[in-house]
Structures are given as structure tokens and as C-alpha cells.
């Protein structure tokens, strides 16, 4: 298969970890792995100027529980209240909801303990007034947050990304992390029941401005291997066909016109690719779309 734009041999070079997706989730995963001493490769179909994905366009609101900002405003919050709010919203009423519930419990634990300090130590700061997004009713008995928990980061989305982009560049300078932009993953390689690498298409170089659709012209192919492959790409907000396909039945027919609040590359294509490799995808009708 020759050589790709990374300047590495596509057939023989291996990495400890390949991360598919250079958005916020991918950057967090990649920097944590690199700081743990792993050799990491981050692949993304978009050009380098789109590093950070759709998080760049976000308002930068973060979920903290019983934070200094809340206490300063007189907001009385607690781990127990936050978990009750979360469970009241999510429901977790399907047989496949065991692991989603476990994840929710772990995330509330994180938000009520080390999350803020971890981000603060990386340089992140927050607006002193806590917002009340996803507002619930009276008391923690139904849908939404019963108290304000929406902590807006100074610098909004770019401010959330900055520490992780910085850490990624530092890891890159140490030789622990490598980026492969314009590398579109089309297949996860499965051998003996395990994912061992990725195959895909090299997309033509494109200097398009961040947020605008980039070219899908194919200029080559690649195959890369790793001990672990992490797919950190799952948003479907710009793929209205996919949104309509999995539109919740309880809401009736999907709307004929949809307002898109994310760039065109938020296409959800890695969902089917991951499922084809053996992943179990659940709750595809439970969507959350923010118009950033």
C-alpha cells in the first residue's frame, strides 16, 4: 500500500494506541495515553485547521457538582442531588441500560470530586455566574437539573480545548503523539475477534476555513495497526438522513426541515463502521442536539 502522508510505512508501523477523531474526546484520550508513556496516533478526516472538532463551536458549559462557583451564589448542590436529577432525566428503563447507568454514576462521582481540580490545574477557568441549562421542574423529581450546574468556561469552546491541544502538541514534540489529518477511517481491522488496526482513505489536502465543508476527493489509502483502537467520533448532528433514520418513534415523524448547528463533518459515519467490527450500539434513538 506504499506510504501515506504521515511518512510511515502503512504495512509495518504499529502504535500503542490509535485514536479515531481529533475532537475533544479524542484529544483527552490521546493526551492521557501519551502522558502514560504510550505511542499514540490520532486520525481525523478533516484538515489540521479543524483540530478540536465541534467542541470548538460550543459554549463551553461544563457540569460540576457543589463547586466554589455554586457555593458563592448560594446554590445548594450535592452528589446525591445531582445523581437523583440525572437518574430522573435518563430513566434507564431498557435492558441495555446497565452500562449507561454505571457510566452516569461514575461521571457524577467525577463531577462532584476531581473533575474541576483536574481542569483547573491545566489552566481552565470559569465565569463566576453558574447557568441553569437543561432546567428541571420543582425539586429533583423529574426531568432536568433542579439547581444551576452549567459552568461556562472562559474562552467558551476554544477555552475548553486549549489545555488538551497544548498537551497534545507537547506530546507531539516528545515523539509520543502523532496526528494524521485527512485520514478518513473506512474500516476497523478485526483479527481473531480483536480490533488490531484501521484501514481508510487519504483525502486530498484542503485549506478550507474551519467549520466549512472540506473536500472528499480521495488521493490514496492507508492501513495502520495498534495494540488498542479508540473510536472517539460519534456525533450525527450534520447528517440529517441519519437523524431521521433513528428519530424516536414517540415523537412521530421527523421534521421536514432541520436546523444544523454543527459542521458538516459531524456525520456519524464511524457508528456503522464500528458496528460492522462487532460493537454493540444502543439507544440510537436517544439523541441530544445543541444548536451551537
Language-model segment annotations:
Residues 22, 66, 202, 233-234:
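Glycine-rich, N-terminal phosphate-binding loop of Rossmann-like dinucleotide-binding domains
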Residues 35-56:
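Glycine-rich FAD pyrophosphate-binding loop
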Residues 17-42:
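N-terminal Rossmann-like FAD-binding beta1-loop-alpha1 element of flavoenzymes
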Residues 27-30, 116, 271:
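Generic hydrophobic/aromatic pocket-lining and core-packing "Φ" positions
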Residues 1-17, 35:
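Extreme N-terminal leader/targeting segments of oxidoreductases
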Residues 56-86:
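N-terminal glycine-rich dinucleotide-binding loop that anchors FAD/FMN and/or NAD(P) in oxidoreductases
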Residues 205-292:
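Glycine-rich loop(s) and the adjacent beta-strand/alpha-helix scaffold that form part
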Amino acid at each position: 500500500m506504499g506510504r501515506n502522508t504521515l511518512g510511515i510505512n502503512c504495512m509495518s508501523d504499529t502504535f500503542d494506541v490509535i485514536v479515531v477523531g481529533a475532537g475533544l474526546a479524542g484529544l483527552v484520550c490521546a493526551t492521557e495515553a501519551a502522558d502514560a508513556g504510550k505511542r499514540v496516533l490520532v486520525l481525523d478526516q478533516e484538515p489540521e485547521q479543524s483540530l478540536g472538532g465541534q467542541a470548538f463551536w460550543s459554549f463551553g458549559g461544563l457540569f460540576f457538582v457543589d463547586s466554589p462557583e455554586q457555593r458563592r451564589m448560594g446554590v445548594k448542590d450535592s452528589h446525591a442531588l445531582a445523581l437523583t436529577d440525572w437518574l430522573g432525566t435518563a430513566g434507564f428503563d431498557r435492558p441495555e441500560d446497565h452500562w449507561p447507568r454505571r457510566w452516569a454514576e461514575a461521571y457524577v462521582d467525577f463531577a462532584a470530586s476531581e473533575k474541576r481540580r483536574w481542569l483547573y490545574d491545566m489552566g481552565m477557568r470559569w465565569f463566576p455566574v453558574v447557568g441553569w441549562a437543561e432546567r428541571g421542574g420543582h425539586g429533583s423529581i423529574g426531568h432536568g437539573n433542579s439547581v444551576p450546574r452549567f459552568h461556562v468556561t472562559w474562552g467558551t469552546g476554544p477555552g475548553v480545548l486549549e489545555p488538551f491541544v497544548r498537551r497534545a502538541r507537547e506530546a507531539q514534540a516528545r515523539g509520543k503523539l502523532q496526528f494524521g489529518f485527512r485520514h478518513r477511517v473506512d474500516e476497523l481491522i478485526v483479527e481473531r475477534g480483536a480490533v488490531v488496526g484501521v484501514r481508510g482513505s487519504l483525502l486530498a489536502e484542503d485549506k478550507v476555513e474551519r467549520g466549512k465543508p472540506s473536500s472528499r476527493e480521495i488521493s490514496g489509502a492507508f492501513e495502520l495497526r495498534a495494540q488498542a483502537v479508540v473510536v472517539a467520533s460519534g456525533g450525527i448532528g450534520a447528517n440529517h438522513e441519519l437523524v431521521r433514520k433513528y428519530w424516536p418513534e414517540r415523537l412521530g415523524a421527523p421534521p421536514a426541515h432541520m436546523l444544523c448547528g454543527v459542521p458538516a463533518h459531524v456525520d456519524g459515519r464511524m457508528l456503522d463502521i464500528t458496528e460492522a467490527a462487532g460493537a454493540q450500539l444502543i439507544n440510537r434513538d436517544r439523541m441530544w442536539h445543541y444548536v451551537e
